[in-house]
Swiss-Prot record:
It is found in: Host nucleus. One of its GO terms (cellular component) is host cell nucleus. The keyword Lipoprotein does not apply. Belongs to the alphaherpesvirinae HHV-1 UL3 family. This is Nuclear phosphoprotein UL3 homolog. Keywords: Host nucleus, Phosphoprotein. The keyword Phosphoprotein applies. It comes from Varicella-zoster virus (strain Oka vaccine) (HHV-3). Phosphorylated.
Amino acid sequence: MFSELPPSVPTALLQWGWGLHRGPCSIPNFKQVASQHSVQTDFTENSVDANENFPIGHAGCIEKTKDDYVPFDTLFMVSSIDELGRRQLTDTIRRSLIMNACEITVACTKTAAFSGRGVSRQKHVTLSKNKFNPSSHKSLQMFVLCQKTHAPRVRNLLYESIRARRPRRYYTRSTDGKSRPLVPVFVYEFTALDRVLLHKENTLTDQPINTENSGHGRTRT
């Protein structure tokens, strides 16, 4: 127990040499600050000329024109845990976007899986004696970029691809050691204040459709 109460925060700051002043705080306007630091991405008549080149990235990089880049302001994150059909699900989503949204520009990442034990070594040994050996939990994360005007269409395509999964082919390991079908897949939607520019090479435009894993055979995840 303390013999006396600890000093207050202002008192401690004064002892450390910080100066304190009374008065209103100057809190900047968020919208004003955002407009001052935002990057102009609307390609209007006042933007850079179409024939003018501008450097991208560090010095020494190849100069690109603005026509080589596409602005995005909406991001979807597809997330799931212990989804055994991770690669097949993301391939299905990518194939659906290429086939059903060919007239709009969309970009997406490949399957990103992260695994972790989630139990200590001592607890893992104890559970092993009870004939239940929990394996690592694998997390699926896939990101899809589009423009806000195309967000409803992309959202519907994502929902359709997720609902089209076959229950007999997707299972997860629950806490009781049994396998259960249809792992829940979550879709999160984010909207940016400023648009993000991506090169056209990173979009799904005119990309070949991978039909290697579209059959009923087993896919390695």
